Amino acid sequence: MDNYQLKNELLVPASKGGAAILENGDRIEIVDVEGKQVGDLMAWVLDSKKEWFSPAHTITHNWSINLNVGDFLVTNMRREIFKIIYDDVGYHDIVVPCCDNEAYIRRYGIENHRSCLENIREALVGVAEGRHLSGELAWNIFMKNKIGIGGEMIYEAPSHKPSSKIIMEVLLDSLIALSACPQDQTPTNGWNCSEMKINIWEKK
């Protein structure tokens, strides 16, 4: 990455979460190490507990549920927080909430299954306390969903390869948390939950 140097590298273990602080002007690179893995991303403006990345506001900002290179992620205050500058996968989900404990109980009858919401909650411990957490605040990176003719949500097995990545320019000082999704009851992660990596780049 020309004119940038690696500032921090964070490995997010399979079915776990990780968090990092970003500065305006940084670039964040999210890498799927083994392929076919979904990462659920939440973000908050660093100096505010009342402003966070909002999928709903992002949809209306771009007038699309499909985010592409050149599109912006925005906050609940409608400020641009990230800009997508590279993406070699091309499919993501911004409609469905991240998985939580209740989803595994109600859908599959499984108690105490790991979930993206719990992964993100754990990742924030010791990094940032008191942040607003809710499943609908997640962007499901590399998740291959589509909406059918009748409006139904169709979950498809991902097809992206190892080392697939997306890179975003950071536009506001922010805090991010990423869950390497632990969903193993559907083909969401290719039936094999695996690790992800966050690379943070700064200008030289």
Name these PLM-found stretches.
Residues 1-204:
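Acidic, Ser/Thr/Pro
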